[in-house]
A protein has these predicted regions:
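Secondary-structure transition motif
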Residues: 1-94
């Protein structure tokens, strides 16, 4: 799947799949009410140029959000510690 975000082309077939364990929430409105929705089939990818991409599905549409490295770290440390430690190093034991 190809997405264009911030004038960069992200081709998920050429990117490394980092995690499928994350959750993504987005805001939508219905009848002037603001609601929070959960994206389905959430995945985080990393490109060879160290760009990060979060993809998710809503109804019958695929969506993507470009992530900074810090945002990717936040998602991974919260939802997929194993992937976090693979890409950013092990955390110190308490």
């Amino acid at each position: 799947m190809i997405f264009v975000t911030n004038s960069l082309k992200y081709d998920t077939t050429k990117m490394e799949l980092v995690s499928t364990k994350c959750e993504y929430k987005y805001i939508g409105t219905i009848l002037n009410m603001t609601l929070r929705y959960s994206g389905k089939n959430v995945k985080i990818f990393k490109s060879s140029k160290n760009h990060w991409l979060l993809t998710y599905e809503i109804d019958y549409k695929n969506c993507a959000v470009a992530l900074s490295e810090e945002e990717a770290k936040e998602y991974l440390i919260h939802y997929d510690l194993e992937a976090y430690e693979k890409y950013f190093g092990e955390l110190e034991e308490a």
